[in-house]
Amino acid sequence: MGMIFQSAALFDSLTVLENVMFPLDMFSSMNLRERTKRAMDCLDRVNLVGAEEKYPGEISGGMQKRVAIARAIALNPKYLFCDEPNSGLDPKTSLVIDELLHSITQEFKMTTIINTHDMNSVMGIGENIIFIYEGRKEWQGVSADIMGSTNKRLTDFIFASDLLKEMRQAVTHQK
């Protein structure tokens, strides 16, 4: 299983390449050349070739998240767990991370679980969505079903902003 934490959780004393190689060094039987190639392939996949000799403190938050993604997929996991992968990122970078997670999930045929409060992410890349309230599953479905949901807790959470409430009213009045 690969994991992406809310903070990128990178080792400050390791370069970008060394951070991605870390799980390979710990858990694979590959030789150094194979591990380096695999890590570079992962960095290429997240568009970070050229940053491999930099340290986490020398790169942006969005780049740090992409390093974390590269590290998480280095061992070709069947499952990927992401805890608030867009935390602290601007909307444009959040969209890049969402698109990257979605395409990697498809490409590597992984099951990806994303824990998030970002409704843009939920609506944009969520395929099977589970809304949990106080530790219990409150609602399950697909993003297209959210707009018409009658679950009060779900709709209160999703439509907390006035703009989203107006959008929902417009959609439900069109039916």
Where are these regions (language model features)?
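Helix N-cap at the start of a conserved alpha-helix in ABC-type nucleotide-binding domains
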Residues: 91-93
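C-terminal boundary and immediately downstream tail of ABC-type ATPase nucleotide-binding domains
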Residues: 144-175
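Conserved ABC ATPase signature
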Residues: 55-59, 63
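Short helical segment in ABC ATPase nucleotide-binding domains corresponding to the A-loop/adjacent helical element
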Residues: 17-25
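Catalytic Walker B motif of ABC-type/P-loop ATPase nucleotide-binding domains
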Residues: 80-83
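A short, proline-enriched helix->beta-strand linker immediately N-terminal to the Walker B motif
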Residues: 74-78
